[in-house]
């Protein structure tokens, strides 16, 4: 009988405790409240510290690292596809973009050339070509040849089609048009 009383009393206490407990508030929270709470937590110093620790964790960094082969494949597909070729053709028609791109490449090319000029092997090779006694004769023959003239014409055409030159030429034309408009007024 005492076991039955103890069991009955335990059940009664358990029911009364659970009946008096507050409702589960997590079920009542809507999305906006949860979002605000999470944002507030992340803005605290503890939240920022937790994120920094998470980003410094090696296992997490390994999970975040993207497969380099996948990146390479995506870039190759994007750049070499017909859509990619069309995209690059269209974007390089924009003189402002082409100018910026050319300026970026120009600085890199200048760095490479300056590095080469400091390279002793490159200097020796360049000097041996320049000091060759027959080079003067070859230069004058070359300048008179039809091949050189064709090459020179090609270089001039390339220069005229260069994004940097186009931009400079465009700017000069605009400036000249403004000056002409001012003079005629």
From Swiss-Prot:
This is Spore germination protein GerD. The keyword Lipid metabolism does not apply. InterPro entries: GerD_central. It holds the Pfam family GerD. NCBIfam families: spore_GerD. It comes from the Bacteria. Residues 1-19 form the signal peptide. It is a lipid-anchor. Keywords: Cell membrane, Germination, Lipoprotein, Membrane, Palmitate, Signal. It is found in: Cell membrane. A lipid is attached at residue 20 (N-palmitoyl cysteine). May be involved in fructose recognition during germination. A lipid is attached at residue 20 (S-diacylglycerol cysteine). GO terms for cellular component: plasma membrane; spore wall. It comes from Bacillus subtilis (strain 168).
């Amino acid at each position: 009988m005492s076991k039955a009383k103890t069991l009955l009393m335990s059940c009664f206490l358990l029911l009364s405790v659970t009946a008096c407990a507050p409702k589960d508030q997590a079920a009542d929270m809507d999305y906006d409240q949860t979002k605000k709470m999470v944002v507030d937590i992340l803005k605290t110093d503890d939240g920022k510290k937790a994120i920094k620790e998470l980003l410094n964790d090696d296992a997490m960094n390994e999970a975040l690292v993207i497969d380099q082969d996948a990146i390479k494949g995506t870039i190759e597909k994007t750049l070499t596809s017909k859509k990619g070729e069309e995209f690059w053709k269209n974007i390089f028609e924009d003189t402002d973009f082409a100018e910026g791109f050319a300026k970026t490449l120009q600085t890199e090319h200048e760095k490479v050339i300056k590095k080469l000029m400091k390279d002793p092997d490159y200097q020796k090779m360049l000097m041996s070509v320049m000091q060759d006694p027959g080079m003067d004769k070859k230069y004058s023959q070359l300048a008179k040849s039809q091949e050189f003239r064709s090459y020179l014409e090609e270089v001039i055409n390339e220069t005229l089609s260069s994004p940097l030159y186009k931009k400079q030429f465009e700017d000069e034309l605009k400036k000249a048009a403004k000056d002409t408009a001012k003079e005629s007024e």
